Amino acid sequence: MNTAKPWLKNYPAGVPAQLILPTQTSLVDLLDESFARYPKRKAIESMGHSFSYEELNVLSEQFASYLQSLDLPMGSRVAIMFPNVTQYLIAMLGALRAGLVVVNVNPLYTSRELEHQLNDSQALVLVLSENFAHIYQQIAEKTSVKRVIVSSLGDLLGPKGLLVNFAARYIKKIIPQWAFPHTRFTDALQLGKQHLFQKPTIDPNAIAFLQYTGGTTGVSKGATLLHRNVLANVLQTDAWLEPVLRDQHDQQLVFLCALPMTHIFALTACALLGLRKGGLLLLVANPRDITGLIKLLAKHPEVNIFPGVNTLFHALVHRPEFSKLKLSNLLVTIGGGMAMQKKTADHWQAITGNPIAQGYGLSETSPVVCVNTPLIEKFTGLIGLPLPNTDVVILGEDGKRMPMGEAGEICIQGPQVMAGYWNQPEETRKVFTVDGYFKSGDIGFMDSEGYVTIVDRIKDMIVVGGFKVFPNEVEEVLASMPGIHECAVVGVEHRKLGEIVKAYIVKDKYDLTNADVLQFCKEQLTSYKRPRKIVFVSELPKSNVGKILRREVRKLGDSSS
């Protein structure tokens, strides 16, 4: 156990070193408190339509009741695949309230990626947006799923929803054709209304989420997050923000939810923390629509809390119309998911007057581990201090603690750390030290004041716009393509996305083209995993035992041979 915790002396006044965390409380109990305390408050605004806490309570209970009517065993997995719309929150909360396990699915996934996640989790139910139904249809017969619930984006928007759905299908034509047995989301709610909801007793040690993350082998693994893990991280983050929020207790906080809530950062820092605080969640279904996001911010200058990633902040500050906004109510801007660039952070503060407090976390830690104090006056470039109840040590390759200021692997112990990887005991064993610290796989160092800095990443992980990409997965896909003899994938710097994927290919088919490779990858990989640059070479550098040396591959440049 680490007894030296230099970060504690730098905690803001009012933030305790140790929180007294509830031992008999589930995440559902925490949410029920908010439903009871704030029934008339607005909980959600999505696509111009709002829902109160009372309405969210009723709708999520109806969905929970519907799930119970399916006679699923407690702990069954429910996969959910939505952008940031009200249906996601209803399905997620409903599954938790029914005593089931939420499997968040990236809505950008290809059929191959979706198939793996559904089968690995053994999900019995899939709830998804109609926009992605054609993706599931391609692998429907290959999965463990027994029941599919499909929703159109406009389903809960009243009369306006009819127009939204009509436009999506027949004007914008963004809904590809699909056909398979399913239940409509609205029908599920009606069926749930007819079924008496039986509130289950949920053990805090029960699984709440299987949050899938890449592994060092490139195989996507489910981080097993218990109710007590996620509950702890919500309470830790709440306590950490208290110094800037303590004067707002009588006012409703407004959270901008631009990051996808299927991602662990937004799930905790936007959705669950927002509901815990009785906040209003402004849902952004398409954060790539920067013009639409700026219009939303113009309509809601009262935004108080803005979690984001560097690419989002970068896109906003480079729009002239963003600089005209008056975001004087902005209390906290949290940067996570990828490294923040100082130029972007400084530009953000110059426009908004609010510094970006950079943090650090992982899917395996629910996610927040470290974050800068929200009282900072300017961007620091550091990932901040460990949260209350959290211990961080820097270990060398020999497993021994590194001296202050020297780099090693960031290792974490705390109530937010996962129980392990779903059905992968050997992989779980690899990522924990003998005394119970989670080995993050990231290289960093801690200074004498307890501030942590990220230096580099172990292995060769690539971070594209905040999303982790593992070269082995991309290489495996490329290697399966006829005409490719060998390949190696590396990350290269990119001004907007941080990094992009670059592939070096040795071909055994002379007429293989860049376009051929890009089309193949489009069918097999979600967009951020696809190579943006492709270089054909005659051979790849290897070690004396035949291992491709990525560090040497990076030196090859852009010249094809």
Regions found by a protein language model. Name each.
Residues 52-54, 208-235:
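Conserved AMP-binding A3 loop
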Residues 45-51, 64-112, 130-131, 258, ...:
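Conserved AMP-binding/adenylate-forming
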